[in-house]
Amino acid sequence: MQLTVVEASLQQVVLTAPLAPNINHRETVFGGSASAVAILAAWSMLHLGLAAEGLGSRLVIQRNTMDYLAPIDGNFTAVALAPARRAWESFTRMIRRKGLGRITQAAALHYQGQVAGALAGEFVAFGPGYA
């Protein structure tokens, strides 16, 4: 996939990937690659936030939807912004209380200045000691 991390902060995660290793038979980005890059951006955003709060956990994706809005036939980026404050507080509160939290995290695929894809992923964090 040849991903490159452009930014990884508590405000956003930005990943970029080239077309060549992610190409399909139509000479555009393979949908599976696009989805994987978006999921990784979303997962990384949550992982960074949990680490910053000292909430070591196992973070997994439970389900996702991916909307492909335009073909991508070149280098593209995936951007995940920090979750809304209220959603984040509820997520971390549940991890602290029950050792398990769920949150929906979005990521967008950008190509040539346009949004070319949108991910909505539901992630689950298992806190320390959760079996």
Predicted region positions:
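Short structured motifs
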Residues: M1-L3, Q62-Y68, S90-T92
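Catalytic strand-loop segment that frames the active site of acyl-thioester-processing enzymes
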Residues: M1-V29
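Hydrophobic residues in beta-strands and at strand termini
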Residues: A17-L19, Y68, A82, A125
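A short mixed-secondary-structure module that forms the rim of ligand-binding clefts
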Residues: N22-G49
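Hydrophobic beta-strand-centered segment that forms part of the acyl-chain substrate-binding groove
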Residues: M45-R85
